[in-house]
């Protein structure tokens, strides 16, 4: 029987994250809702304490590295006598025992391998949020994924592994709150304007440039229509992504005032942006493991027009809980799909059906319950 769960993740963002960090958000939102006692072990970034008690069942232990340690052991000599992986194990041994605990490692097979090397008998779970070619020391590893798409991906590559689905989630309380009333006014959007919304990274795999190209044509065919883009167009300073971001900014500038670049927004602000949308568009160019933008838009009661690649199509069902973008995707096909969705007399009913679906399956409360059931299924025997 498991008496304590240790959650951990790569040493990049502290928990709870102060910005958009999906994996760290998942850990925090689920851990604090569990009835099984648990501890989070994560990196200590500037402004975070040594320790944070969240509630009676959840606390956070922060792992800090001094500047001298980093310079001497991680940069100059690369000896690293007390690495991040060992510090995670030390936290486990401080709060529980190897026999009574399981360590859930999020989205880093490298960290899984490092912990396994240092503790061959530890109970480990690998929680993958993306499709990476597996490099695990345990052929029969226990793996959690958010979608059927990702489950099939890992089962094909690790046939002896136990792969189970626990989805990503959203904060139901946030999406029950009344949204900000004056956001349209702040963005200089008329109340009767049709608003298309894109939210996500400004990167080639998300398809935003193709959407901008389609919108440039669409605005000549439809009057009083706006495209709002939520995402940081300066996230990358150099390389291909930076070049892509410049192309996106140039395309938006060419469109003019009908395209509103709203920049990056905090997770707490996103429900206000979904509220102003008539249609939320997810033009992904790659297979998505899940898609939080689609789930959040559905939770806000908004119609979603999305790529059917990967895990998105498991909950965005064409004509039932949303609409699919036709393949192969092009400017013309996107225009046709936008017009089709906006013209559908059942659009609001479809959006309401989608809202009911995500509230019943993807709230953090439901996700935490599914995770807890899976842990008991694997370890309480």
Swiss-Prot record:
<comment type="similarity">
    <text>Belongs to the glycosyltransferase group 1 family. Glycosyltransferase 4 subfamily.</text>
</comment>
<keyword id="KW-0808">Transferase</keyword>
<dbReference type="GO" id="GO:0008917">
    <property type="term" value="F:lipopolysaccharide N-acetylglucosaminyltransferase activity"/>
</dbReference>
<dbReference type="GO" id="GO:0005886">
    <property type="term" value="C:plasma membrane"/>
</dbReference>
<comment type="pathway">
    <text>Bacterial outer membrane biogenesis; LPS core biosynthesis.</text>
</comment>
<protein>
    <recommendedName>
        <fullName>Lipopolysaccharide 1,2-N-acetylglucosaminetransferase</fullName>
        <ecNumber>2.4.1.56</ecNumber>
    </recommendedName>
</protein>
<keyword id="KW-0448">Lipopolysaccharide biosynthesis</keyword>
<keyword id="KW-0328">Glycosyltransferase</keyword>
<keyword id="KW-1003">Cell membrane</keyword>
<keyword id="KW-0997">Cell inner membrane</keyword>
<dbReference type="GO" id="GO:0009244">
    <property type="term" value="P:lipopolysaccharide core region biosynthetic process"/>
</dbReference>
<dbReference type="InterPro" id="IPR001296">
    <property type="entry name" value="Glyco_trans_1"/>
</dbReference>
<comment type="function">
    <text>Transferase involved in the biosynthesis of the core oligosaccharide region of lipopolysaccharide (LPS). Catalyzes the addition of the terminal N-acetyl-D-glucosamine (GlcNAc) group to the outer-core glucose II, the last step of the lipid A-core oligosaccharide biosynthesis.</text>
</comment>
<keyword id="KW-0472">Membrane</keyword>
<dbReference type="Pfam" id="PF00534">
    <property type="entry name" value="Glycos_transf_1"/>
</dbReference>
């Amino acid at each position: 029987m498991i008496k304590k769960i240790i959650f951990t993740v790569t040493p990049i963002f502290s928990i709870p994250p102060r910005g958009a960090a999906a994996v760290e958000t998942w850990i925090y939102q689920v851990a604090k809702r569990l009835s099984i006692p648990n501890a989070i072990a994560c990196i200590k970034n500037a402004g975070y304490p040594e320790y944070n008690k969240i509630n009676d069942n959840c606390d956070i232990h922060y792992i800090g590295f001094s500047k001298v340690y980093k310079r001497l052991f991680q940069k100059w000599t690369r000896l690293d006598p007390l690495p991040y992986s060992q510090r995670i194990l030390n936290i486990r041994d401080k709060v529980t025992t190897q026999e009574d605990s399981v360590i859930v490692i999020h989205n880093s097979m490298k960290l899984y391998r490092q912990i396994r090397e240092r503790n061959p008998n530890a109970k480990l779970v690998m929680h993958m949020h993306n499709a990476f070619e597996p490099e695990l020391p345990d052929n029969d590893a226990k793996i959690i994924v958010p979608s059927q798409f990702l489950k099939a991906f890992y089962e094909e590559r690790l046939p002896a592994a136990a792969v189970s689905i626990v989805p990503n989630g959203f904060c139901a309380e946030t999406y029950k709150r009344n949204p900000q009333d004056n956001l349209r006014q702040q963005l200089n959007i008329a109340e009767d304007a049709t608003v298309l919304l894109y939210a996500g990274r400004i990167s080639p795999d998300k398809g935003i440039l193709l959407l901008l190209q389609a919108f440039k044509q669409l605005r000549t065919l439809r009057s009083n229509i706006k495209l709002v883009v939520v995402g940081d167009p300066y996230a990358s300073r150099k390389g291909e992504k930076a070049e892509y971001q410049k192309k996106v900014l140039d395309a938006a500038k060419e469109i003019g005032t009908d395209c509103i670049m709203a920049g990056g927004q905090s997770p707490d602000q996103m429900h206000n942006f979904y509220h102003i949308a008539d249609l939320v568009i997810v033009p992904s160019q790659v297979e998505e493991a899940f898609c939080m933008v689609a789930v959040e838009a559905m939770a806000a009661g908004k119609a979603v027009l999305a790529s059917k690649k990967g895990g998105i199509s498991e909950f965005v069902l064409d004509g039932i809980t949303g609409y699919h973008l036709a393949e192969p995707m092009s400017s013309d096909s996107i225009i046709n799909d936008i017009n089709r969705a906006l013209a559908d007399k059942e659009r609001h009913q479809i959006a309401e059906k989608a809202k009911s679906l995500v509230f019943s399956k993807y709230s953090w409360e439901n996700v935490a319950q599914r995770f807890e059931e899976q842990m008991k299924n694997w370890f309480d025997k």
